[in-house]
Amino acid sequence: LPIQKPDSAIERLQSKFPHLKITYRNVPWTKDRAQLEKEVPKELWRDATVLLTLSALPPKPEDAPLLDFIQLFSAGSNQLASHPIYTDTDIPIATASGVHGPQIAEWVIMTHLIHTHRYNQLYEAQKESRWAKDGYKVKDSVGMRVGVLGYGSIGRQVGRVAKAMGR
């Protein structure tokens, strides 16, 4: 994963399941398979039975003969669609679909408020001690209609938050 090693989470897993061998690699996120192959030595794949990853996979299915399950941290798996593990094996691949709704809905509402309240323009004016007489025509969004394209976990959460805010 392209994040700092989660020592406390790994320690909790090890204490609960002492028979597990956990190997953590900080691998930058990339679609470049050649770079991924350099980041993870082939010998690490040989004994892997479960893989938790964003995009790093063994170069070929035979490089990980014991691999039984792959958990992606992404909501989708399209970044792996042409990989031989994805196309030529029956190894189950699970995604994190559905877990990102609250965070992305908050981002959507935040960017809507930044836009309708002209935050960027007002903040720049504030830094320069300039005060606009018309307030840059800030809009209240109560009563505005919100269109949601796609009604998955993210779209549903955006709708719930927007409704709670009077949209």
Regions found by a protein language model. Give the residues of each.
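A generic local structural motif
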Residues: 10, 36-40, 55-59, 80-81, ...
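Rossmann-like dinucleotide/phosphate-binding beta-alpha-beta segment
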Residues: 134-167
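A generic structural signal for alpha->beta connector loops
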Residues: 19-21, 66-67, 90, 143, ...
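Short gly/ser/thr-rich secondary-structure transition/capping motifs
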Residues: 27-36, 49-55, 125-134
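N-terminal glycine-/charge-rich "phosphate-binding" loop or analogous flexible N-terminal tail
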Residues: 1-48
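Phosphate/diphosphate ligand-binding glycine-rich loop within oxidoreductases
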Residues: 46-126, 138-139
